[in-house]
């Protein structure tokens, strides 16, 4: 059973969010870095699953997310994929339906990049980005780094799906579960396993947001504390235990960056 909500902030502050043995594999920046020189928008396309036909509510490349969000959710795993041991509860093959909301819901309405922010020349998600880099890049286009609650809701929808695409784990829908992790010539770094943003169209959330359960690890700001005080990463290609919408990778500060780290932006509606 997985229960996610504000209580997890304490765990992050204590540094006990599990991240696996390769947390230090990517290089850590020693201070603020320059914002990326090229940041392309997230794509385009009409929102899928957004409430109503309100396409003018968001900037180009963003999707409208609107509905009733549950801050604290109970999701019960019916069967785990891995044998008993350290990694037994890392990957859930199937969750019970429906999930249970354990707190009052609140109305949310915001915009989010349909795809991760990308390199213009390759279409790959930007990587080696810190939270501070993401903040500068998003603010340069009038947007912001997503809050964790916004990211969660854009991923799971009102049904509180454990995975953006449903209740059963189908990692092949996404650029995920890469296990050959270390770079050949730089074994202290993660291998670059990015896929072009949006190249896995079935890795889509109820709102049509892509790649939330794979590709780069995306920076978000934890709710309930001053912005940038506690930051976590959501979704990635390299940690099988971080495939679900409510999963998060903690233990890094706002200046950390690695082969796996990227971002998408959020914004208020027009």
Give the predicted meaning of each segment.
Residues 131-249, 254, 259:
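Functional-site microenvironments in short loops/helix caps that host divalent-cation chemistry
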Residues 2-3, 8-17, 22-139, 159, ...:
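Short, compositionally biased
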């Amino acid at each position: 059973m997985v229960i996610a909500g504000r209580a997890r902030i304490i765990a992050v502050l204590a540094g006990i969010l599990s991240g696996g043995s390769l947390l230090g594999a990517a290089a850590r920046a020693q201070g603020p870095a320059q914002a990326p020189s090229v940041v392309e928008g997230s794509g385009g396309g009409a929102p899928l699953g957004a409430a109503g036909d309100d396409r003018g509510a968001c900037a180009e490349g963003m999707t409208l997310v609107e509905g009733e969000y549950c801050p604290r959710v109970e999701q019960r795993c019916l069967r785990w994929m891995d044998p008993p041991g350290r990694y037994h509860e890392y990957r859930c093959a199937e969750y019970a339906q429906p999930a249970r909301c354990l707190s009052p819901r609140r109305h949310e309405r915001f915009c989010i990049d349909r795809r991760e922010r990308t390199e213009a020349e390759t279409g790959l998600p930007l990587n080696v980005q810190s939270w501070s880099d993401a903040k500068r890049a998003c603010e340069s286009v009038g947007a912001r780094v997503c809050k964790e609650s916004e990211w969660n809701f854009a991923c799971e929808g009102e049904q509180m799906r454990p995975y953006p695409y449903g209740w059963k784990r189908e990692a092949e829908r996404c650029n995920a579960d890469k296990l050959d992790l270390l770079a050949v010539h730089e074994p202290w770094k993660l291998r670059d396993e990015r896929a072009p943003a949006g190249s896995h169209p079935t890795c889509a959330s109820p709102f049509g947001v892509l790649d939330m359960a794979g590709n780069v690890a995306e920076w978000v700001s934890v709710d309930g504390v001053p912005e940038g005080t506690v930051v976590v990463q959501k979704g990635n290609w390299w940690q099988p235990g971080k495939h679900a919408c409510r999963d998060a990778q903690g233990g890094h500060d706002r200046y950390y960056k690695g082969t796996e780290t990227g971002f998408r932006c959020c914004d208020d509606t027009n």
